[in-house]
């Protein structure tokens, strides 16, 4: 799997980027709208990526941060919701707001997003609410920042996620949550 791509943006066409790595390999990467707007043609970028293989072909999706990628992956697990629809959802709302909408079971808010029917919004909430509620974390930004930090330190994502869930207390700052999660992980 290709987890990330670092390189120079050769060309932008809508939400599709051509990124050349230092080794000279050029990747075609489909991004959400915000990520595409953030990168400049001719500029350097790093994208968190997901390689999708389906009967329609192979597509490399790119995101400016890990939270967007994680949300995209969660959305693609929803029945009858493919990567194209997941990308469309992420392109129309910021990740923190989407996570909050799902955790608070805001079907009405989700169904207002372009291309999302009420039934699709209900399915998203039904299938993902536990994933976001189980963390018991009101501020998902702190949760994801802490998770990213632990993963970047080399902890497997599953262990990092469990540690963050176990030690989180409402009102914690990101640095406190990381510190407590590291203590938890060191005692395992």
Curated annotation (Swiss-Prot):
Residues 143-186 are annotated as: Domain III. One of its GO terms (molecular function) is ATP binding. Keywords: Cytoplasm, DNA damage, DNA recombination, DNA repair, DNA-binding. It is found in: Cytoplasm. The RuvA-RuvB-RuvC complex processes Holliday junction (HJ) DNA during genetic recombination and DNA repair, while the RuvA-RuvB complex plays an important role in the rescue of blocked DNA replication forks via replication fork reversal (RFR). RuvA specifically binds to HJ cruciform DNA, conferring on it an open structure. The RuvB hexamer acts as an ATP-dependent pump, pulling dsDNA into and through the RuvAB complex. HJ branch migration allows RuvC to scan DNA until it finds its consensus sequence, where it cleaves and resolves the cruciform DNA. Pfam families: HHH_5 (PF14520), RuvA_C (PF07499), RuvA_N (PF01330). InterPro entries: DNA_helicase_Holl-junc_RuvA_I (IPR013849), Hlx-hairpin-Hlx_DNA-bd_motif (IPR003583), NA-bd_OB-fold (IPR012340), RuvA (IPR000085), RuvA_2-like (IPR010994), RuvA_C (IPR011114), RuvA_C_sf (IPR036267). It comes from Thermotoga maritima (strain ATCC 43589 / DSM 3109 / JCM 10099 / NBRC 100826 / MSB8). Homotetramer. Forms an RuvA(8)-RuvB(12)-Holliday junction (HJ) complex. HJ DNA is sandwiched between 2 RuvA tetramers; dsDNA enters through RuvA and exits via RuvB. An RuvB hexamer assembles on each DNA strand where it exits the tetramer. Each RuvB hexamer is contacted by two RuvA subunits (via domain III) on 2 adjacent RuvB subunits; this complex drives branch migration. In the full resolvosome a probable DNA-RuvA(4)-RuvB(12)-RuvC(2) complex forms which resolves the HJ. It comes from the Bacteria. Belongs to the RuvA family. Transmembrane segments: none annotated. Residues 1-64 are annotated as: Domain I. One of its GO terms (cellular component) is Holliday junction resolvase complex. Has three domains with a flexible linker between the domains II and III and assumes an 'L' shape. Domain III is highly mobile and contacts RuvB. This is Holliday junction branch migration complex subunit RuvA. Residues 65-143 are annotated as: Domain II. The keyword DNA-binding applies.
């Amino acid at each position: 799997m290709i987890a990330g791509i670092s390189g120079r943006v050769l060309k932008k066409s809508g939400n599709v980027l051509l990124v050349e790595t230092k080794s000279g390999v050029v990747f075609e990467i489909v991004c959400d709208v915000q990520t595409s707007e953030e990168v400049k043609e001719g500029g350097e970028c790093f994208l968190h990526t997901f390689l999708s293989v389906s009967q329609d072909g192979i597509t490399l999706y790119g995101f400016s941060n890990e939270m967007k990628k994680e949300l995209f992956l969660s959305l693609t697990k929803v029945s009858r919701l493919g990567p194209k629809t997941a990308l469309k959802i992420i392109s129309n709302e910021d990740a923190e707001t989407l996570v909050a909408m799902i955790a608070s079971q805001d079907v009405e808010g989700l169904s207002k997003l372009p291309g999302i029917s009420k039934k699709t919004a209900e399915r998203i909430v039904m299938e993902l609410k536990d994933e976001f509620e189980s963390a018991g974390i009101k501020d998902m930004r702190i949760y994801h920042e802490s998770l990213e930090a632990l993963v970047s330190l080399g902890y497997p994502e599953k262990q990092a996620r469990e540690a963050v869930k176990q030690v989180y207390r409402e009102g914690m700052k990101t640095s406190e949550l990381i510190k407590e999660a590291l203590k938890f992980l060191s005692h395992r």
